[in-house]
Structures are given as C-alpha cells and as structure tokens.
Amino acid sequence: MQQKKEKWYEMLIKLEIDTENIKRNLEKIKEINQNVICVLKDDAYGLGIESILPVLINEGCSYFATAYIGEALKIKNIVKRDFPDKVGKISVMVLNYIEENELKKSVKNGIEITIFNFEQLEKYVRVLKNEERIKVHIKFNTGMNRLGFDENETRKLIEKIKVISNIDIMSIYSHISDVGNKKETEKQIARYERIVSIFDKNEVKYGVKHIQASPLLFKYRGKYNYDFARVGMAIYGMEPLSEKTGLYPVVKLLL
C-alpha cells in the first residue's frame, strides 16, 4: 500500500494597511507644509498604488511622484477608472530616467519628466521635438552627488532651455543629503537658492520649488518651506529621523 506523501503548508501572513493612520500622517505633514507631492515610488513603498492612491486623492492630494513610467501610467489609469472627475487635475512626475521608446507615451499621457543632465536633455528634446508641450522638472545636485545638474552648469542650462520652444519647466528641485549635518544642510540650501536666483535674474519661467523630503520637513519644520514638500516615507509612518516624530504606523502584520 502506497504511503501518503506529507503535505507542506504555507503560513500565510496578511498585511493590514491602516488608512486612518495614513490620514493622520498627512495631517502632521500638512501642519508643516500644506502643499505636498506624495511619493508613490516602488509601488507606494511596497504597499500598493491601488490601495494607497485612492486614500490620498480622497484626502485632497493631487500631485504625485513615481520612480518609473509604469507607476506613473498606473496612477493615470486608476484616476481615469475611479476618479473621472479628477482627470486633468492630477499631476504625476517621474523622478528617474525614461527610456526613449517610452518618452512619447509619457508626454501623451500628461506625465511630467525629470531632467538631470545635458545628455538626457538633448535626447529628450530630439525625441519630443514634434510634441506640442513637454512638462519637465529640473533636478540640481546641491550636495547629494547622485543625480542632477551642478550649480556651475546653471547658466549653460538656461542658455539651452531658452532656445527650446516647447518646454514648460514645472519645477526646480533638489534633495538634501544629510539633514543631521546642520552645516552641510545650510550649504546645500544656499546653493539651491543661488541656482533659483540665477533662473529669476534671467527671467526663466518655472512653476514651483521643492527641496523638502520627509527628513528635512520634520527636522527643520517650516524653516525650509518652499512651494511644495516632496514626501514619501512619512506618509507611510516610517520615521525619517533618529528621534521620534510622532508619526503613526500604517502597516500591521497579521499572522
């Protein structure tokens, strides 16, 4: 008689998302800066854009940032499907590089793209030369030393932008590398303000300014408020600093 094989069982772990705590965290963020670009990169930090986006839209959020084009298109599709009255009122920016074959799709879907070096600028302009308008965010490296134009490239960048007829600059932004280092943070802010002033002196039109991510927002409160705060981890209850900020946990594991 054939023996029965042992069965192996998987232990299922459920992740519960507390949407009320997302709302509470948003309130804490908006106590410092009312205008928020909600970062939904990495599928809303692993919690799922499908689950998180409706909560944020229902709380009045209308500006979102993603790492990649696929996530941005997903947001646009959810808005069309579930929030038809919000079509044309929800803005989405992509923080990372977009491949050439996806650029036209991005523009046609109203997705805003980030420019952070000259090679990329020239490539995007060449591919999109026949598009009516290109909405771009310009990222500057003020000390993070990862992505972005350097301060000494600002005037050259402005010269190039001035001859591009179909470009709309949605924002000038940067990112602070270490908010715990007060001296370095102040240096980065000073660089950023010098860059912005060069745009202003050259009468280059742009939309908004943003440099606050979650750590800068909670470390210095409203000291470095610009037009928007660009917030990800704080929305999801992740502490942006070593000290407690009073954010509410958003996820709970159910065994």
Predicted features and spans:
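Anionic-ligand-binding alpha/beta catalytic cores of soluble enzymes and soluble regulatory domains
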Residues: T185-L255
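Short aromatic-glycine motifs in intrinsically disordered, low-complexity regions
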Residues: W8-K14, K156, P240-V250
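Generic structural motif
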Residues: E20, F118, G143, S214, ...
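Generic structural "secondary-structure junction" signal
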Residues: I17, L47, R146-E151, D178, ...
